[in-house]
Amino acid sequence: MTRRSWLRLMAAGVLVVWLCLFLHWDNTEKSMIRALLVETNGDSWTVGLLYQFPVASADSSEAEAAIRLCIGRGPELSSAISAAEEALPQRADWRLCEYLLAGQDSVQRTLSACEELFLHRPYGRLASRVFGRSFSVEILKERADETDVLPENLLQCIKNAAPAAPRLYQQSSGFILPVVELEDENAHYRPEALVVTPEQTGQLTESQTEMALLLQGKSWTDTGEHRFALEAGPLRLRRTFCGVEREGERFLLRVNALSRNNALPADAEAELEALCADTVRRCWTLGLDISGLGAHQALRDGHFALTTKNVCPEIRADVKLMKC
């Protein structure tokens, strides 16, 4: 082999080593932001960042690393985020930030501000899964200083509930918002969700929340199961099908489902029918057409649109349960 060939081979080797070192540094020397927590008291903003400093590839959403929390404050949302970034051990990388947690006392203002900011700054995604939370960033920081596992448990909680959570860009039409709570070293979602619309925010009962998820084709569980605490006893449903029909001047909501109970509780179908109609009316009052009655009306009558600004139409529910 000639001297020139040896030089070319050595140059290629040096280049490969340099590229490997560069890629390793680029992938690991970052603080990967996994979730953004935002709250405001009207005069200032407080931000919390759940981040990890991975030892594996930064492109892997399952990178093995402990989850940590840092916070920042500022008169504006952008300045609060910048302050939180300065508290990170390494420069921030937002590629894996898929979750936004808003304080339940300032949900509407927080979500509107985040949507506007994300349109111009790469701090998050308009497709971020959105959650409410009953605790402040300060309380989370205090508890996280006492136990290292809390931030990681919080992230795991919202990851588990993510399929049932709405996305940020859906706020203009309203949505059902799950609320996360802290309990010792763990976190869990509250059985009672919020209805968030541009007009107002209201709370559903536990049964209404479960029915609202059922009508939307969502579930808290990985198996798609729905659980109801009826007066006659607990009921577990799966493989639900929901449909809307026009019945004269009123709407008919059909719900068919498989029951996982060995024996159906007495009057289970009647209880679910009443709950279904009650949930639709409650959401309608808060400004959310959860069953798409307006869209069904528009398809039927063309130009005429039924919106939540109108009085809620008459509703009848028909529930049919079958054993697995």
Which residues fall in each region the model found?
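Membrane-proximal alpha-helical signals and transmembrane carboxylates
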Residues: M1-C324
